[in-house]
Amino acid sequence: MKRILIGVGVLLLLAAGAAAGIWAWKARNPADVRGSATQEFETTEEPGATTRPETEILEEPWPQYGFDLARTRYAPDFKLRPPFRRLWDVRGGKLIEYPPVVAYGHVYFATSDGRFFAVDAETGKKTWERELGRCTAASPAAGNGIVYQPVMHGFPCGKRRNQPSFLFAMDAHTGAVKWRFRAGVIETSPLLVDGRIYVGSWDTRVYALDAATGRKLWSFKTGDAVKGGAAFAKGTIFVGSYDGHVYALNSNTGKLRWRASAQSRFGGKGTFYATPAVAYGRVYIGNTDGKVYAFGAQSGKLLWSKTTGNYVYSSAAVWDRKVYAGSYDGHFYALDAATGDIRWKFEAHGPISGSPTVLDGIVYFSTLKQRTFALDARTGRRVWTFPDGKYSPVVADEKHLYLTGYTRVYALEPSSR
């Protein structure tokens, strides 16, 4: 009888352990939320639509990270399709983690050791160069004859850890410094909207600055470092924080409109490193918990979440009612913008950290194994590859595709031309 009781006890303990394990797994991996096209899904807010507000019409070919103010990473007017041939390439000498911007007939980019280049877009010849004295991990922004570039101290800058960080404003034609704004570590790619610059910092704040003078207009404190860039739509700034929340702020005053949360895991949350993209009345953003999220742009309500197999540092691109993002699990995903369902996924055989771009029905991305892929954005079929590129590879203008390699920027044009 004692043996029977002991056996029953062991079975009960095993069952309890299994139940606890299942509970722990579910707590660590909360179930995905499936969305609907009937809830806060505005089909008139298609990326690239001609109905977008006048403030969103761009004066330069590719003036900031993510292309437009909503950071959709989709450029509707550039008809460039592979295969490509190389026109020129420029060596930066060090890692180029973030892509350039294209404005005023130039390609502007920074290397990780703080060198900033202005290169003629047609010839690849260097027009000017400036040593910024700090390392960089962000794209510039360009407008009003000025190029804005953040720099940082701290990791991975080593011995420069105790030095301040700045946002530099430089004359786009000469490189002369017009002003600089001091803050905590700035890893966010700045957003230029209607004469204002929006940038986040490791000091937990989002800043709004006068783009002409650098004067601080307002700041908003989040719960942790702000490492991703901000997006703009309908008078609202959207930004993610390492505290596991997405914030919607009044672009004029900095007042909080709403705060949304990643799904909890054991009482904690993943962090938002990615820059949000705004389309269809929704805010799309990846998280280090391995999920891509969609929140209502007006309400902040969680509309859907979709789990990938690992971290999502990749900032999403949005086009054709699909959300495109890469994951550290080595897959590139096309998700239904309304529901979050997987429309297709592509095995890239390497972690994906950077962000995609959509041009003329082709989506481009790179893996950490330093290969760039071009896929049919509707089907996921591979159409072209390039043996360089590691993070966010592609920007463009009407004639050229500019591909960011590990230490080089390439200018490519379609082979058919």
Language-model regions: role of each:
Residues 25-51:
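Ser/Thr/Pro/Gly-rich low-complexity linker/stalk segments immediately outside membranes or between
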Residues 120-124, 171-174, 210-214, 250-254, ...:
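Short loop/turn segments that connect beta-strands within beta-propeller blades
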Residues 88-101, 129-144, 149-166, 177-193, ...:
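Extracytoplasmic beta-rich repeat domains
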Residues 1-14:
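N-terminal Sec-pathway targeting helices
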Residues 48-86:
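Blade/loop signatures of beta-propeller domains
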Residues 14-24:
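Hydrophobic alpha-helical membrane-insertion segments, chiefly the h-region
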